[in-house]
Swiss-Prot record:
Keywords: ATP-binding, Kinase, Nucleotide-binding, Transferase. CDD domains: bacterial_phosphagen_kinase. One of its GO terms (molecular function) is creatine kinase activity. Belongs to the ATP:guanido phosphotransferase family. ATP binds at residues 24-28, 82, 115, 166-170, 197-202. Signal peptide: none annotated. NCBIfam families: PRK01059.1-3 (NF002193). Gene3D superfamilies: Glutamine synthetase/guanido kinase, catalytic domain. This is Protein-arginine kinase. The gene is mcsB. InterPro entries: Arg_Kinase (IPR023660), ATP-guanido_PTrfase (IPR000749), ATP-guanido_PTrfase_AS (IPR022415), ATP-guanido_PTrfase_cat (IPR022414), Gln_synth/guanido_kin_cat_dom (IPR014746).
Length: 335
């Protein structure tokens, strides 16, 4: 059976070339509506559905997807594509508005009434902020957004009060991970109000040496200041990763090549494999490609990291386990 993994990938991810370290960037804006209790305090589901209707009316050009009308597998696919958060699934009256290429989404009734997301691979944080801000302006023309002249935008979580903005960059950091530098880096940037998390944000697991770097606080700084400082933090981490890769290539080349080719051999020959192992093997193969140890046609790290997740493997109508299907996809696409 041939597996067309491209059907499971958002258009914005497919249309851009991959880079050695930066995988994607995201801007998220949290907003709430005046005269509505917050989502976690709804008395009935109807409170939530009223908010959904109001937000949908304000953004008529987006496609609405109500989570109560979707099965669990479809919801988890949207989590895997970063269109919604795992927390949104837990809400009884939740929805998401999505644009054509899925680079823009608006979650409704997560922790806050509205969470605007703009995502891209080769787009700067400032450009993404401009896109998210445009949606914010459109909402503001139709809805009464909670705002305080002294504090800024009012949010459910105190750490989001102010700009209500979380900026984040997803980085592939195999060198720093292999050399066990990530804990020290996380401690360092934490002192400046920035944090490193797993692939799906707070409390999520790290897969394939992939980390999300983002700001922690939004009060007392402008959107531009947050973006500029995060960009400096990310550039320093990228610099450190490049230095480590150079050292691995110069002083530990045989060991690094052995690691890369072992992972390549496993991915090309495995008959069953877990998500955790597959992600780390893919990461090491990508490292080998970036260091010019190997050349693979059409190797797409970002796309494969999405396509091998369980929600996309449960579609197949056969008796194979998820681990077997994952191995089939990897053998087929890594040649």
């Amino acid at each position: 059976m041939t597996h067309n993994i491209h059907d499971n990938i958002s258009q914005w991810m497919k249309s851009n070339e991959e880079t050695p370290i930066v995988m994607s960037s995201r801007i998220r804006l949290a907003r709430n509506l005046e005269n509505h209790v917050h989502p976690l305090m709804y008395a009935t589901e109807n409170d939530g559905f009223r908010v959904i209707n109001e937000v949908q009316d304000a953004l008529p050009n987006f496609e609405l997807m109500r989570l109560d009308q979707m099965d669990q597998q479809s919801k988890m696919k949207m989590v895997a594509k970063h269109l919604i958060s795992p927390e949104l699934i837990k809400q009884p009256a939740a929805a998401v508005l999505v644009n054509d290429d899925e680079s823009l989404s608006v979650m409704i009734n997560e922790e806050d009434h509205i969470r605007i997301q703009a995502m891209g691979t080769d787009t700067t944080l400032q450009a993404l902020y401009n896109q998210a801000s445009s949606i914010d302006d459109e909402l503001d023309r139709s809805l009464d957004i909670s705002y305080d002249e002294q504090l800024g935008y009012l949010t459910t979580c105190p750490t989001n009060i102010g700009t209500g903005m979380r900026a984040s960059v997803m980085l592939h950091l195999p060198g720093l991970s292999i050399m066990k530098r990530m804990t020290r880096i996380a401690q360092t940037i934490n002192r400046f109000g920035y944090t490193i998390r797993g692939i799906y944000g707070e409390g999520s697991q790290v897969y394939g040496h992939t980390y999300q770097v983002s700001n922690q606080l939004t009060l007392g700084k402008s959107e531009l200041e947050i973006i500029e400082t995060l960009t400096e933090v990310v550039n320093q981490i990228i610099h450190d990763e490049k230095q480590i890769r150079q050292k691995l290539d110069t002083y530990n080349q045989l060991e690094t090549q052995d690691r890369v080719f072992r992972s390549l051999g496993i991915l090309q020959n495995c008959r069953m494999i877990t998500m955790e192992e597959a992600s780390y093997r893919l990461s090491e193969v990508k490292l080998g490609i970036d260091l010019n140890y190997i050349e693979l046609q059409n190797f797409k790290f970002n796309e494969l990291m999405v396509a091998i997740q369980s929600p996309f493997l449960l579609d197949e109508e056969d008796d194979k386990s998820v681990k077997e299907k994952r191995a089939d996809i990897l053998r087929e696409h890594i040649k």
